[in-house]
């Protein structure tokens, strides 16, 4: 299992628009090959900063299957007008789950 962490800074005043768009985009992720879960967190210290936490079965499910699809283009069309700049994306694997 791979956890994608995407950090997105949203343009000032577009937080509600971004949240509405990302809520609609959840359906796209739900039907994406290998996507296991999708959550969005908003920073308390920096309210214009969001982190998408997306679990994929494999790295390729994200980097090949999803980003090469029309679904990815549809997702980006819903939310990218709200982006302050390009998202920062990192893929992680579980090293320890203590409890």
Regions found by a protein language model. Give the residues of each.
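Glycine-rich beta-strand-turn "strand-cap" elements at beta-sheet edges
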Residues: 2, 39-51, 76-99
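Residue-level signal for secondary-structure boundary sites
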Residues: 16, 60-62, 97-99
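An amphipathic, aromatic/His-enriched active-site/gating alpha helix that lines ligand/cofactor pockets
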Residues: 24-36, 55-90
């Amino acid at each position: 299992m791979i956890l994608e962490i995407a950090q997105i800074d949203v343009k000032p005043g577009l937080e509600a628009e971004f949240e509405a768009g990302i809520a609609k985009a959840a359906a796209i992720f739900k039907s994406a090959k290998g996507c296991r879960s999708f959550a969005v967190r908003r920073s308390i210290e920096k309210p214009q900063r969001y982190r998408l936490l997306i679990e994929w079965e494999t790295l390729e499910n994200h980097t090949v299957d999803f980003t090469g699809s029309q679904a990815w283009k549809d997702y980006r069309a819903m939310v990218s007008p709200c982006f302050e700049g390009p998202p920062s994306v990192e893929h992680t694997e579980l090293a320890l789950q203590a409890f």
